[in-house]
Amino acid sequence: MAGSSVAQKTWELSNNMQEVQSIDEIYKYDKKQQQEILAAKPWTKDHHYFKYCKVSALALLKMVMHARSGGNLEVMGLMLGKVDGETMIIMDSFALPVEGTETRVNAQAAAYEYMAAYIENAKQVGRLENAIGWYHSHPGYGCWLSGIDVSTQMLNQQFQEPFVAVVIDPTRTISAGKVNLGAFRTYPKGYKPPDEGPSEYQTIPLNKIEDFGVHCKQYYALEVTYFKSSLDRKLLELLWNKYWVNTLSSSSLLTNAEYTTGQVFDLSEKLEQSEAQLGRGSFMLGLESHDRKSEDKLAKATRDSCKTTIEAIHGLMSQVIKDKLFNQINTF
Protein backbone atom coordinates (compact mmCIF):
# COMPACT_ATOMS: atom_id res chain seq x y z
CA MET A 1 0.00 0.00 0.00
CA ALA A 2 1.52 3.31 -1.13
CA GLY A 3 0.09 5.34 1.77
CA SER A 4 1.44 2.86 4.28
CA SER A 5 4.98 2.94 2.87
CA VAL A 6 5.05 6.77 2.76
CA ALA A 7 3.88 7.04 6.37
CA GLN A 8 6.45 4.46 7.47
CA LYS A 9 9.28 6.20 5.59
CA THR A 10 8.34 9.57 7.10
CA TRP A 11 8.44 8.11 10.61
CA GLU A 12 11.83 6.44 9.99
CA LEU A 13 13.37 9.65 8.58
CA SER A 14 12.01 11.75 11.48
CA ASN A 15 13.72 9.45 13.98
CA ASN A 16 16.95 8.87 11.98
CA MET A 17 16.34 5.13 11.76
CA GLN A 18 19.46 3.25 10.61
CA GLU A 19 19.32 -0.09 8.81
CA VAL A 20 21.72 -2.87 9.78
CA GLN A 21 22.69 -4.80 6.68
CA SER A 22 23.41 -8.13 8.34
CA ILE A 23 20.83 -9.62 10.69
CA ASP A 24 23.48 -11.81 12.33
CA GLU A 25 25.66 -8.77 12.98
CA ILE A 26 23.20 -7.22 15.42
CA TYR A 27 21.27 -10.25 16.66
CA LYS A 28 24.17 -12.62 17.23
CA TYR A 29 24.60 -13.18 20.96
CA ASP A 30 28.16 -14.02 22.02
CA LYS A 31 27.74 -15.52 25.48
CA LYS A 32 31.49 -15.71 26.12
CA GLN A 33 32.00 -12.06 25.17
CA GLN A 34 29.15 -10.93 27.42
CA GLN A 35 30.51 -12.96 30.34
CA GLU A 36 33.96 -11.43 29.86
CA ILE A 37 32.44 -7.94 29.91
CA LEU A 38 30.47 -8.74 33.08
CA ALA A 39 33.62 -10.12 34.72
CA ALA A 40 35.76 -7.09 33.76
CA LYS A 41 33.14 -4.54 34.90
CA PRO A 42 34.76 -1.57 33.11
CA TRP A 43 31.93 0.73 34.26
CA THR A 44 33.22 0.54 37.86
CA LYS A 45 36.46 2.28 36.80
CA ASP A 46 34.75 4.99 34.75
CA HIS A 47 31.43 6.39 35.99
CA HIS A 48 30.82 7.80 32.51
CA TYR A 49 31.79 4.57 30.72
CA PHE A 50 28.57 4.00 28.76
CA LYS A 51 28.05 6.81 26.26
CA TYR A 52 25.68 5.39 23.64
CA CYS A 53 22.37 3.56 23.56
CA LYS A 54 21.03 1.77 20.47
CA VAL A 55 17.34 0.87 20.35
CA SER A 56 15.81 -1.53 17.83
CA ALA A 57 12.83 -0.25 15.86
CA LEU A 58 10.62 -3.02 17.22
CA ALA A 59 11.53 -2.30 20.85
CA LEU A 60 10.95 1.41 20.21
CA LEU A 61 7.48 0.85 18.78
CA LYS A 62 6.49 -1.50 21.60
CA MET A 63 7.60 1.01 24.24
CA VAL A 64 5.91 3.99 22.57
CA MET A 65 2.63 2.12 22.02
CA HIS A 66 2.66 0.93 25.64
CA ALA A 67 3.37 4.45 26.91
CA ARG A 68 0.61 5.88 24.72
CA SER A 69 -1.91 3.30 25.98
CA GLY A 70 -1.41 4.61 29.52
CA GLY A 71 -2.79 8.06 28.67
CA ASN A 72 -1.99 10.47 31.52
CA LEU A 73 -0.85 7.60 33.78
CA GLU A 74 2.76 6.48 33.96
CA VAL A 75 3.52 2.98 32.71
CA MET A 76 6.57 0.80 33.23
CA GLY A 77 8.36 -2.03 31.44
CA LEU A 78 11.64 -3.89 31.10
CA MET A 79 14.15 -4.05 28.24
CA LEU A 80 16.29 -6.94 27.02
CA GLY A 81 19.63 -6.43 25.34
CA LYS A 82 23.39 -6.63 25.51
CA VAL A 83 26.55 -4.55 25.77
CA ASP A 84 29.02 -3.78 23.00
CA GLY A 85 31.91 -1.66 24.25
CA GLU A 86 30.57 1.73 25.36
CA THR A 87 27.19 1.02 23.77
CA MET A 88 24.11 -0.48 25.41
CA ILE A 89 21.97 -2.24 22.79
CA ILE A 90 18.24 -2.65 23.48
CA MET A 91 16.87 -5.51 21.40
CA ASP A 92 13.38 -6.00 22.84
CA SER A 93 11.03 -4.73 25.53
CA PHE A 94 7.95 -5.88 27.39
CA ALA A 95 5.36 -4.21 29.60
CA LEU A 96 5.07 -4.89 33.33
CA PRO A 97 1.78 -5.22 35.24
CA VAL A 98 2.30 -2.26 37.55
CA GLU A 99 0.08 0.30 39.25
CA GLY A 100 0.54 3.70 37.66
CA THR A 101 -0.43 7.21 38.75
CA GLU A 102 0.09 10.61 37.12
CA THR A 103 3.39 11.04 38.97
CA ARG A 104 4.93 7.60 39.54
CA VAL A 105 4.75 3.86 38.91
CA ASN A 106 4.80 1.26 41.67
CA ALA A 107 6.05 -2.26 40.97
CA GLN A 108 4.43 -4.87 43.23
CA ALA A 109 5.46 -8.47 43.92
CA ALA A 110 3.38 -9.72 40.97
CA ALA A 111 5.42 -7.51 38.61
CA TYR A 112 8.72 -9.01 39.79
CA GLU A 113 7.34 -12.54 39.40
CA TYR A 114 6.12 -11.69 35.89
CA MET A 115 9.53 -10.20 35.06
CA ALA A 116 11.43 -13.33 36.13
CA ALA A 117 9.03 -15.65 34.29
CA TYR A 118 9.17 -13.59 31.07
CA ILE A 119 12.99 -13.55 30.95
CA GLU A 120 13.15 -17.29 31.66
CA ASN A 121 10.62 -18.10 28.93
CA ALA A 122 12.42 -15.79 26.49
CA LYS A 123 15.63 -17.79 26.96
CA GLN A 124 13.74 -21.02 26.27
CA VAL A 125 12.75 -19.74 22.81
CA GLY A 126 16.27 -18.59 21.94
CA ARG A 127 16.29 -14.98 23.16
CA LEU A 128 19.50 -15.13 25.20
CA GLU A 129 19.73 -11.41 25.99
CA ASN A 130 19.52 -10.41 29.63
CA ALA A 131 17.59 -7.57 31.21
CA ILE A 132 19.55 -4.43 30.36
CA GLY A 133 17.25 -1.70 31.65
CA TRP A 134 13.80 -0.44 32.49
CA TYR A 135 11.58 2.15 30.88
CA HIS A 136 8.68 4.27 32.05
CA SER A 137 6.65 7.18 30.71
CA HIS A 138 6.47 10.87 31.61
CA PRO A 139 3.23 11.90 29.86
CA GLY A 140 3.51 15.59 29.01
CA TYR A 141 6.51 16.65 31.08
CA GLY A 142 9.62 15.57 29.21
CA CYS A 143 12.38 13.00 29.45
CA TRP A 144 14.40 13.26 32.67
CA LEU A 145 14.72 11.39 35.98
CA SER A 146 12.76 12.41 39.07
CA GLY A 147 14.01 11.80 42.60
CA ILE A 148 12.20 8.44 42.76
CA ASP A 149 13.56 7.49 39.32
CA VAL A 150 17.12 8.34 40.41
CA SER A 151 16.77 6.18 43.55
CA THR A 152 15.35 3.28 41.52
CA GLN A 153 18.10 3.49 38.91
CA MET A 154 20.84 3.73 41.56
CA LEU A 155 19.48 0.56 43.15
CA ASN A 156 19.37 -1.19 39.77
CA GLN A 157 22.94 -0.17 38.94
CA GLN A 158 24.08 -1.41 42.33
CA PHE A 159 22.68 -4.92 41.92
CA GLN A 160 21.92 -5.48 38.19
CA GLU A 161 24.71 -3.84 36.21
CA PRO A 162 24.86 -3.05 33.35
CA PHE A 163 21.48 -1.27 33.51
CA VAL A 164 19.98 1.78 31.82
CA ALA A 165 16.87 3.86 32.48
CA VAL A 166 14.75 4.98 29.51
CA VAL A 167 12.06 7.66 29.75
CA ILE A 168 9.41 8.22 27.06
CA ASP A 169 7.00 11.13 26.74
CA PRO A 170 4.10 9.81 24.62
CA THR A 171 2.22 13.11 24.72
CA ARG A 172 5.08 15.15 23.29
CA THR A 173 5.76 12.35 20.81
CA ILE A 174 2.27 12.81 19.35
CA SER A 175 2.53 16.61 19.50
CA ALA A 176 5.94 16.87 17.80
CA GLY A 177 5.61 13.88 15.45
CA LYS A 178 8.99 12.57 16.62
CA VAL A 179 9.72 10.10 19.41
CA ASN A 180 10.56 11.94 22.63
CA LEU A 181 12.87 9.48 24.40
CA GLY A 182 15.88 9.71 26.69
CA ALA A 183 18.31 7.11 28.09
CA PHE A 184 20.06 7.79 31.41
CA ARG A 185 22.52 6.35 33.90
CA THR A 186 23.09 7.59 37.43
CA TYR A 187 26.33 8.45 39.19
CA PRO A 188 27.30 6.75 42.47
CA LYS A 189 26.33 8.53 45.69
CA GLY A 190 28.80 11.25 46.62
CA TYR A 191 30.25 11.50 43.11
CA LYS A 192 30.48 15.02 41.70
CA PRO A 193 30.48 15.01 37.89
CA PRO A 194 32.60 17.56 36.00
CA ASP A 195 30.80 20.56 34.58
CA GLU A 196 29.68 19.47 31.13
CA GLY A 197 28.15 22.78 30.14
CA PRO A 198 24.52 23.35 29.20
CA SER A 199 22.60 20.31 27.99
CA GLU A 200 19.93 20.32 25.30
CA TYR A 201 17.05 22.52 26.44
CA GLN A 202 13.66 20.97 27.12
CA THR A 203 10.44 22.39 28.50
CA ILE A 204 9.80 21.42 32.13
CA PRO A 205 6.39 22.24 33.72
CA LEU A 206 6.52 24.66 36.65
CA ASN A 207 5.29 22.04 39.13
CA LYS A 208 8.16 19.70 38.09
CA ILE A 209 11.03 22.20 37.91
CA GLU A 210 12.09 21.78 41.54
CA ASP A 211 12.25 17.98 41.30
CA PHE A 212 14.15 18.28 38.01
CA GLY A 213 16.66 20.81 39.33
CA VAL A 214 17.47 18.99 42.58
CA HIS A 215 18.45 15.73 40.88
CA CYS A 216 19.70 16.81 37.44
CA LYS A 217 23.39 16.45 38.45
CA GLN A 218 22.94 12.88 39.73
CA TYR A 219 22.70 11.29 36.28
CA TYR A 220 23.77 11.79 32.68
CA ALA A 221 22.15 11.16 29.31
CA LEU A 222 23.35 8.67 26.73
CA GLU A 223 23.33 9.42 23.00
CA VAL A 224 20.36 7.49 21.59
CA THR A 225 20.15 6.07 18.07
CA TYR A 226 17.68 3.67 16.48
CA PHE A 227 18.32 0.80 14.11
CA LYS A 228 16.42 -1.79 12.10
CA SER A 229 17.36 -4.99 10.32
CA SER A 230 15.67 -6.65 7.36
CA LEU A 231 13.75 -8.77 9.88
CA ASP A 232 12.55 -5.61 11.64
CA ARG A 233 11.48 -4.25 8.25
CA LYS A 234 9.05 -7.14 7.74
CA LEU A 235 7.57 -6.69 11.21
CA LEU A 236 7.31 -2.92 10.75
CA GLU A 237 5.47 -3.36 7.47
CA LEU A 238 2.87 -5.51 9.24
CA LEU A 239 2.46 -2.88 11.97
CA TRP A 240 2.24 0.03 9.53
CA ASN A 241 -0.35 -1.76 7.38
CA LYS A 242 -2.52 -1.88 10.47
CA TYR A 243 -1.95 1.61 11.90
CA TRP A 244 -0.98 3.94 9.02
CA VAL A 245 -4.57 5.13 8.50
CA ASN A 246 -4.43 6.69 11.98
CA THR A 247 -1.95 9.23 10.59
CA LEU A 248 -4.59 10.62 8.24
CA SER A 249 -7.66 10.15 10.43
CA SER A 250 -6.22 11.72 13.60
CA SER A 251 -5.21 15.27 14.46
CA SER A 252 -2.61 16.26 17.05
CA LEU A 253 -4.70 19.39 17.73
CA LEU A 254 -7.60 17.24 18.91
CA THR A 255 -5.62 14.35 20.39
CA ASN A 256 -3.43 16.66 22.46
CA ALA A 257 -5.94 19.43 23.18
CA GLU A 258 -5.65 18.91 26.94
CA TYR A 259 -1.85 18.90 26.75
CA THR A 260 -1.77 22.13 24.70
CA THR A 261 -4.12 23.84 27.16
CA GLY A 262 -1.89 22.72 30.02
CA GLN A 263 1.16 24.13 28.21
CA VAL A 264 -0.52 27.53 27.87
CA PHE A 265 -1.52 27.61 31.55
CA ASP A 266 1.99 26.56 32.58
CA LEU A 267 3.50 29.29 30.39
CA SER A 268 1.14 31.84 31.97
CA GLU A 269 2.29 30.84 35.47
CA LYS A 270 5.96 31.08 34.46
CA LEU A 271 5.45 34.58 33.02
CA GLU A 272 3.60 35.73 36.15
CA GLN A 273 6.41 34.39 38.32
CA SER A 274 9.06 36.14 36.22
CA GLU A 275 7.09 39.39 36.26
CA ALA A 276 6.81 39.24 40.05
CA GLN A 277 10.57 38.68 40.40
CA LEU A 278 11.36 41.55 38.05
CA GLY A 279 9.02 43.77 40.08
CA ARG A 280 10.79 42.91 43.31
CA GLY A 281 14.17 43.36 41.69
CA SER A 282 13.39 46.95 40.65
CA PHE A 283 13.30 47.96 44.33
CA MET A 284 16.67 46.36 45.07
CA LEU A 285 20.04 47.83 44.19
CA GLY A 286 23.26 45.97 43.42
CA LEU A 287 21.60 42.62 42.76
CA GLU A 288 22.82 41.89 39.25
CA SER A 289 22.66 38.11 39.80
CA HIS A 290 18.97 38.43 40.69
CA ASP A 291 18.33 40.30 37.42
CA ARG A 292 20.22 37.67 35.44
CA LYS A 293 18.14 34.88 36.97
CA SER A 294 14.93 36.74 36.14
CA GLU A 295 16.08 37.34 32.57
CA ASP A 296 17.08 33.68 32.27
CA LYS A 297 13.59 32.60 33.35
CA LEU A 298 12.06 34.98 30.82
CA ALA A 299 14.29 33.57 28.08
CA LYS A 300 13.20 30.04 28.97
CA ALA A 301 9.54 31.08 28.99
CA THR A 302 10.06 32.59 25.52
CA ARG A 303 11.52 29.32 24.24
CA ASP A 304 8.61 27.39 25.75
CA SER A 305 6.20 29.76 24.04
CA CYS A 306 7.91 29.29 20.66
CA LYS A 307 7.84 25.50 21.04
CA THR A 308 4.11 25.44 21.88
CA THR A 309 3.33 27.82 19.00
CA ILE A 310 5.34 25.83 16.44
CA GLU A 311 3.66 22.55 17.45
CA ALA A 312 0.22 24.16 17.16
CA ILE A 313 1.09 25.60 13.72
CA HIS A 314 2.34 22.21 12.52
CA GLY A 315 -0.90 20.59 13.67
CA LEU A 316 -2.94 23.27 11.89
CA MET A 317 -0.88 22.96 8.71
CA SER A 318 -1.41 19.20 8.57
CA GLN A 319 -5.17 19.74 8.88
CA VAL A 320 -5.15 22.34 6.09
CA ILE A 321 -3.15 20.03 3.81
CA LYS A 322 -5.52 17.11 4.45
CA ASP A 323 -8.49 19.38 3.79
CA LYS A 324 -7.00 20.52 0.46
CA LEU A 325 -6.20 16.94 -0.55
CA PHE A 326 -9.44 15.22 0.33
CA ASN A 327 -12.22 17.81 0.67
CA GLN A 328 -11.54 20.28 -2.14
CA ILE A 329 -11.06 18.15 -5.24
CA ASN A 330 -11.63 20.31 -8.32
CA THR A 331 -13.98 18.90 -10.92
CA PHE A 332 -13.13 19.56 -14.55
From Swiss-Prot:
An example Gene Ontology biological process: positive regulation of DNA-binding transcription factor activity
Molecular functions (GO terms): deNEDDylase activity; metal ion binding; metallopeptidase activity
Keywords: Cytoplasm, Cytoplasmic vesicle, Hydrolase, Metal-binding, Metalloprotease, Nucleus, Protease, Signalosome, Synapse, Zinc
Binding site for Zn(2+): 136, 138, 149
Compartments, as annotated in UniProt: Cytoplasm, Cytosol; Nucleus; Cytoplasm, Perinuclear region; Cytoplasmic vesicle, Secretory vesicle, Synaptic vesicle
Motif (JAMM motif): 136-149
Other information: The CSN complex is associated with some 'Lys-63'-specific deubiquitination. Such activity is however not mediated by the core CSN complex but by the brcc3/brcc36 component of the BRISC complex.
Annotated domain remarks: The JAMM motif is essential for the protease activity of the CSN complex resulting in deneddylation of cullins. It constitutes the catalytic center of the complex.
UniProt subunit comment: Component of the CSN complex, probably composed of cops1, cops2, cops3, cops4, cops5, cops6, cops7, cops8 and cops9.
Family classification: Belongs to the peptidase M67A family. CSN5 subfamily.
Protein name per UniProt: COP9 signalosome complex subunit 5
Originating species: Xenopus laevis
